[in-house]
């Protein structure tokens, strides 16, 4: 019986051990609270690269569209390109006001559908300015549908936007922008297979006088992913088209240069002693040439025959000598 009695030290050890055992499940529970389920099908894709070429396209488009709005409204708008947002489609859709003009577009030959979204504030500003208003009587957004007049103004703005967006892509990768249809409710414009799919959204802020509006161009990332390398590493500004434009410009400038064409009929070799003995009235015999070679700055450029035309001496060109002149003539811009 005495052997079964525990000492105080043993009792304390058992008590401490029991408390440690009880603390362990608590620690594991707290650790489990930090664990969250991960579903690779619904998580946001990480796009770390900066889409530099798309930024260039957006800036060019803003310039084109600014000119188009000026011609439409006869007022000078100020268009600011916002930062490109790479976000899930549901985040983009839930921030859209009501009513909103949603225009579905194709960028052929890319697969997929994009959106050009005009906010109601931009539509009302355009309608007000087009009919001579100055914004003193703002239109209230009441969740209603756009009127026929507003829809016609939207169509005109959309046409300008699609033309400008197509032109903006030409220097990077030519695309054909095609209008599909228009909607007012975002539930009818599912441009992605899942609400969590990533889209590339570019906001544009339009300011006309004291009034501001906004529109967006939203493209599924899967749509432009085939051009990902091109969008991350844009071609140099001196592209082939720009090089050709520069070359044509240079050719035009060179062709307007003033040059002196010299046609020598004959050359006579004389010694210095003979030249010193020359007197007025002396005759120097020369051989009449069949053809004359004309020079520019000492460089032979053409062969010709000579004669008279309308009482003046003239040259009839037979052919160009310098091959550079032939190449310049072929490269002359139409």
From Swiss-Prot:
Gene Ontology biological process terms in this record: bacterial-type flagellum-dependent swarming motility; bacterial-type flagellum-dependent swimming motility; chemotaxis; positive chemotaxis
Keyword Cell inner membrane: yes
Alphabetic keyword roster: Bacterial flagellum, Cell inner membrane, Cell membrane, Chemotaxis, Flagellar rotation, Membrane
Keyword ATP-binding on entry: no
InterPro entries the UniProt entry points to: CheC-like_sf, Flag_FliM, FliN-like_C, SpoA-like_sf
GO CC annotations, alphabetized: bacterial-type flagellum; bacterial-type flagellum basal body, C ring; bacterial-type flagellum rotor complex; plasma membrane
Assembly and oligomerization: Interacts with flagellar brake protein YcgR.
Biological role: FliM is one of three proteins (FliG, FliN, FliM) that forms the rotor-mounted switch complex (C ring), located at the base of the basal body. This complex interacts with the CheY and CheZ chemotaxis proteins, in addition to contacting components of the motor that determine the direction of flagellar rotation.
Protein name from the UniProt record: Flagellar motor switch protein FliM
Gene designation: fliM
